[in-house]
From Swiss-Prot:
Belongs to the SIS family. GmhA subfamily. Pfam families: SIS_2. The reaction produces a racemic mixture of D-glycero-alpha-D-manno-heptose 7-phosphate and D-glycero-beta-D-manno-heptose 7-phosphate. Catalyzes the isomerization of sedoheptulose 7-phosphate in D-glycero-D-manno-heptose 7-phosphate. Its main location: cytoplasm. One of its GO terms (biological process) is carbohydrate metabolic process. GO terms for molecular function: carbohydrate derivative binding; D-sedoheptulose 7-phosphate isomerase activity; zinc ion binding. This is Phosphoheptose isomerase. One of its GO terms (cellular component) is cytoplasm. PROSITE patterns: SIS. Substrate binds at residues 51-53, 64, 93-94, 119-121, 124, 174.
Amino acid sequence: MDMHARISQLFQASIETKQQAMEVILPHIVQASELMVQALLNEGKILSCGNGGSAGDAQHFSSELLNRFERERPSLPAIALTTDSSTLTSIANDYSYNEVFSKQIRALGQPGDVLLAISTSGNSANVIQAIQAAHDREMQVVALTGRDGGGMAALLLPEDIEIRIPAKVTARIQEVHLLVIHCLCDLIDNQLFGSEE
Ligand SMILES: O=C(CO)[C@@H](O)[C@H](O)[C@H](O)[C@H](O)COP(=O)(O)O
Ligand SMILES: [Zn+2]
């Protein structure tokens, strides 16, 4: 294997996936940022969840809101539902892994909060149940998906927003998800605290 050629292929595939996504998802990123800004202005918070690399994305997003993104500004309320190992293991052990996020949402979610639900396949059962719990708690959902949107896309309500990456490879979809998360942070900061060049 020519490793340099392989790396070039991976870079090229990532660039092309981002280019293709840019052609379709920009309006959805704008809408998602506006939805989150409205929630934050109304004293709501943003809960986030996902599995594996998407768990990392959920935490990445919440830490950028809670701590900081690129500028000094007040902390913004966000909770990643992927981090409390005692809660996660006890729910999985006593009930089911499919309920690890939904049970937390039923306890922490308030009407007007937003759920950022992340899955490259759109088919992770615990993320699907998280969306159902969010709807029961009168929360709107921003879904970061890929492929055909899976079961998540079918579950979304008209007031929810899906940002679907038009790609099939999990790693490439995740690479665009991270870019979308940084776009959301940038747009949220600019809408709440004024634009910065
Ligand atoms: O990061 C990766 C692959 O790039 C993996 O950890 C991946 O996130 C896991 O297999 C997830 O369980 C996949 O779940 P999903 O994206 O289909 O919801
Ligand atoms: Zn990954």
